[in-house]
Amino acid sequence: PCVTSDYLPTILGLLEAKPVSDRPIDGMSLVPLLDGNLAKRGQPIGFESKGQLAWIGDRYKLYRKGGAAEFKLFDLVADPSEKNDLAKAKPRLAKRLAGELAAWRASCQASAAGKDY
């Protein structure tokens, strides 16, 4: 999967150009994918919309519906239909992914407040 934050690093990669500043760039270049050299993304993608949160990696997806107190955890390789919630069976993994999601959200909030610029 890819997201809009992958556009800039991909365009820079296609043009073999460097960023014009030291500001952090979200996303990743998809040039290796286009060249056939990338089978897995390797870094999770975060989503937040209308109270819903998701942290989606190559294998696991952590998800919380708006208003829900608990996250659900799915193994996208073994359970692509997302029918088996593994959050209780794998609490350490769920906690680690929730921490990564929280760090991503904090980074987004810092960017929105102009702290990266």
Question: What is the role of each PLM region?
Answer:
Residues 3-76, 107-114:
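C-terminal cap/loop subdomain of S1 sulfatases and analogous C-terminal strand-loop tails that border
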Residues 79:
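Intrinsically disordered, low-complexity polar regions and short flexible loop motifs
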Residues 84-92:
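Active-site-proximal N-terminal segment of extracellular/periplasmic enzymes that hydrolyze or transfer
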Residues 13, 36, 89, 99-103:
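Residues within well-ordered alpha-helical secondary structure of globular protein domains
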Residues 10, 82-85:
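A general alpha-helix detector
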Residues 96-117:
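Charge-dense polyanion-binding interfaces
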Residues 55, 94-97:
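Hydrophobic packing residues in well-ordered alpha-helices of helical domains and bundles
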